[in-house]
Amino acid sequence: MLNQIKQDAQTRMTKSIDALRHSLTTVRTGRASPALLDNIKVKAYGTDTPLNQVASISVSEGRSLVISLFDKGMIKDVEKAIYASDLGLTPTVVGTVIRLNLPPLTEERRKELSKSVHGEGEDAKVAIRNIRRDANQQVKDLLKDKQVTEDEARGAEDDIQKLTDKAIKDVDEVVKGKEQELMTV
């Protein structure tokens, strides 16, 4: 029973860290990455469709992205979606492909993005602490129902705290790595 609670807590904490990593892939750094465009939705065939489902996106020359559409009639829709996104990118249509040149980030924009990354890291830490609280509550409920001894409950709470400390350390490392990536010119 206690092992199940600890495993569940660990799984949920790992998912929180993975969600943070995925969320941070959409934060623009100095390098071009197809993941930058993951959140862009295009009006396609009457519905909002993720850009990566209507086009292939590749990196060209380090600082630019090339979008090759599967349906050439959607160029205007994709262009409109890129303008509407909050990435500050200007699409250039070259024949049947769209090029996105990523200008270097200004120092001010880097600091803004760094704050945003830090904030997302804090949100992940809060989620992890909530998971710890839920797990500890489950342990206390078992103790109250006399399904475990006090020593077993205390040991489980210590293990849950160790899991929490490790998860928060992992979040700090992910955030620190992304901030370093942002500050590298």
UniProtKB/Swiss-Prot annotation:
This is Ribosome-recycling factor. Belongs to the RRF family. The lineage of its organism: Bacteria, Pseudomonadati, Pseudomonadota, Gammaproteobacteria, Lysobacterales. SUPFAM superfamilies: Ribosome recycling factor, RRF (SSF55194). One of its GO terms (cellular component) is cytosol. GO terms for biological process: cytoplasmic translational termination; translation. Responsible for the release of ribosomes from messenger RNA at the termination of protein biosynthesis. May increase the efficiency of translation by recycling ribosomes from one round of translation to another. It comes from the Bacteria. Keywords: Cytoplasm, Protein biosynthesis. GO terms for molecular function: ribosomal large subunit binding. The keyword Chloroplast does not apply. InterPro entries: Ribosome_recyc_fac, Ribosome_recyc_fac_dom, RRF_sf. NCBIfam families: frr.
